UniProtKB/Swiss-Prot annotation:
The gene is EGR3. Residues 350-360 have a biased composition (Basic residues). Belongs to the EGR C2H2-type zinc-finger protein family. Pfam families: DUF3446, zf-C2H2. Keywords: DNA-binding, Metal-binding, Nucleus, Repeat, Transcription, Transcription regulation, Zinc, Zinc-finger. Probable transcription factor involved in muscle spindle development. One of its GO terms (molecular function) is DNA-binding transcription activator activity, RNA polymerase II-specific. GO terms for biological process: cell migration involved in sprouting angiogenesis; cellular response to fibroblast growth factor stimulus; cellular response to vascular endothelial growth factor stimulus; circadian rhythm; endothelial cell chemotaxis; muscle organ development; negative regulation of apoptotic process; neuromuscular synaptic transmission. Transmembrane segments: none annotated. This is Early growth response protein 3. A zinc finger (C2H2-type) spans 275-299, 305-327, 333-355.
Length: 387
């Protein structure tokens, strides 16, 4: 969209500035506005610049002639009168908001005097053409819901803490109620927020507000597992209410299969193994009582050690330890020859026998060619003499 100048005004901006009175900017600064009253240096007052105005210099850096001949219709106005300039712009393409393709310039009031009534009518007509109907705006954007006033939100006295340790200033509710008519609740929608400034020493007593977090059943830590002995004892008490008062039944020892080598002598002498197995038909003896206790679990079938992963029970703690390695994948025993790892030491020992057999075979193969490659020894003929 291009604009064409319909009427050229023979007036420059310098003429507008030259109409300002000299007493508009006083040379003396009032004492109330003096910012350097406390300083020792005297304040230097600046006089008005007597040089040419900036607006007087054109684009070609040529100073215009201050005395221009104006027509009769453009005479300089007196000091306190309104200067009104009118003009028109014409546009090529028509638009909806300007049917006549002509825009009238509004009148400019220089010294605060209200402009003419004709200029006001021009501005009003132009604004009414640009602004949409009020009904359409209300239909598109509904009105905000009313909120309560500020005084209703803060009914209790409010105190503000000073970080330097000064006592807080308390404000009574009457101060807020007196200022209530001056505020409009529709203009300032208020949301209550009680998180005021607090001293750093008082931050520990303020509860921390966290947003609601959904319960994820996967991330919730499971409760600790109840020992198996406690569960069994609780079940037995439910079945037999007087379980605690009844005497314990005698320990029954189940017979086990005989040893593979019953007559094999033990390395430990007999007098050093005082703890004998009380089971019938078992001739095992032990040098320590804990060894006897562990052995008796074979007869009783007691397995106090349970795996928490697969709930499998064991009679010995070392058996449970090696079993857990099957779940974790831990293999602490490595072979000295090939570096292969095992979860149990007996497995590594059994694997090491394979390397020992291979080593013996290599030694046998290496010794056989040396014996065959040796030159045959010629045997001297035995001469027998007859007497």
């Amino acid at each position: 969209m291009t604009g064409k100048l319909a009427e050229k005004l023979p007036v420059t901006m310098s003429s507008l500035l030259n109409q300002l009175p000299d007493n508009l900017y006083p040379e003396e600064i009032p004492s109330a506005l003096n910012l350097f009253s406390g300083s020792s240096d005297s304040v230097v007052h600046y006089n008005q610049m007597a040089t040419e105005n900036v607006m007087d210099i054109g684009l070609t850096n040529e100073k215009p002639n201050p005395e221009l001949s104006y027509s009769g219709s453009f005479q300089p106005a007196p000091g306190n009168k309104t200067v009104t300039y009118l003009g028109k712009f014409a546009f090529d393409s028509p638009s909806n908001w300007c049917q006549d393709n002509i825009i009238s310039l509004m009148s400019a009031g220089i010294l605060g005097v209200p402009p003419a009534s004709g200029a006001l009518s021009t501005q009003t007509s132009t604004a009414s053409m640009v602004q949409p109907p009020q009904g359409d705006v209300e239909a598109m954007y509904p009105a905000l819901p009313p909120y309560s006033n500020c005084g209703d939100l803060y009914s209790e006295p409010v105190s503000f803490h000073d970080p330097q340790g000064n006592p807080g200033l308390a404000y009574s509710p009457q101060d807020y109620q007196s200022a209530k008519p001056a505020l409009d609740s529709n203009l300032f929608p208020m949301i209550p927020d009680y998180n005021l400034y607090h001293h750093p020493n008082d931050m520990g007593s303020i509860p921390e507000h966290k947003p609601f977090q959904g319960m994820d059943p996967i991330r919730v830590n499971p409760p600790p597992i109840t020992p198996l002995e406690t569960i069994k004892a609780f079940k037995d008490k439910q079945i037999h209410p007087g379980f605690g008062s009844l005497p314990q039944p005698p320990l029954t020892l189940k017979p086990i299969r005989p040893r593979k080598y019953p007559n094999r002598p033990s390395k430990t002498p007999l007098h050093e193994r005082p703890h004998a197995c009380p089971a019938e038909g078992c001739d095992r003896r032990f040098s320590r009582s804990d060894e006897l206790t562990r052995h008796l679990r074979i007869h009783t079938g007691h397995k106090p050690f349970q795996c928490r992963i697969c709930m499998r029970s064991f009679s010995r703690s070392d058996h449970l330890t090696t079993h857990i390695r099957t779940h974790t994948g831990e293999k602490p025993f490595a072979c000295e020859f090939c570096g292969r790892k095992f979860a149990r030491s007996d497995e590594r020992k059994r694997h090491a026998k394979i390397h020992l057999k291979q080593k013996e075979k290599k030694a046998e193969k290496g010794g056989a060619p040396s014996a065959s490659s040796a030159p045959p020894v010629s045997l001297a003929p035995v001469v027998t003499t007859c007497a």
